Amino acid sequence: MKKKHRIKKNDEFQTVFQKGKSNANRQFVVYQLDKAEQPYFRIGLSVSKKIGNAVVRNRIKRMIRQSITELKDEIDSGKDFVIIARKPCAEMTYEEVKKSLIHVFKRSGMKRIKK
């Protein structure tokens, strides 16, 4: 993912948390905030220390980033997303992570995701 597609600063995370809408399934919580003036989407990732050690947390983040990269043409532009991973992610394969992300994005009202 390119740097312009990432949310890194704490105040940007807090804005999405406070003003955005949330949707969830057992594996992920996704907050989304509409930003009409922004021509692209941005993603912020959060994986708690409760999930596992650094190796496990980084593996989960890599799988989420790869899933987003594959789905980037179907994700609505002009939005900020914060994805929070929950404990069941630690034992999931890449295919399961991608399928779960598609499910939670569909629940959040994205019409373009078809997979």
Swiss-Prot record:
The keyword RNA-binding applies. Belongs to the RnpA family. Its EC number is 3.1.26.5. SUPFAM superfamilies: Ribosomal protein S5 domain 2-like (SSF54211). Consists of a catalytic RNA component (M1 or rnpB) and a protein subunit. InterPro entries: Ribosomal_Su5_D2-typ_SF, Ribsml_uS5_D2-typ_fold_subgr, RNase_P, RNase_P_CS. It comes from Bacillus cereus (strain 03BB102). The keyword Glycoprotein does not apply. The lineage of its organism: Bacteria, Bacillati, Bacillota, Bacilli, Bacillales. Keywords: Endonuclease, Hydrolase, Nuclease, RNA-binding, tRNA processing. RNaseP catalyzes the removal of the 5'-leader sequence from pre-tRNA to produce the mature 5'-terminus. It can also cleave other RNA substrates such as 4.5S RNA. The protein component plays an auxiliary but essential role in vivo by binding to the 5'-leader sequence and broadening the substrate specificity of the ribozyme. PROSITE patterns: RIBONUCLEASE_P. Pfam families: Ribonuclease_P (PF00825). This is Ribonuclease P protein component. GO terms for biological process: tRNA 5'-leader removal. One of its GO terms (cellular component) is ribonuclease P complex. Transmembrane segments: none annotated. It catalyses: Endonucleolytic cleavage of RNA, removing 5'-extranucleotides from tRNA precursor. GO terms for molecular function: 3'-tRNA processing endoribonuclease activity; ribonuclease P activity; tRNA binding.
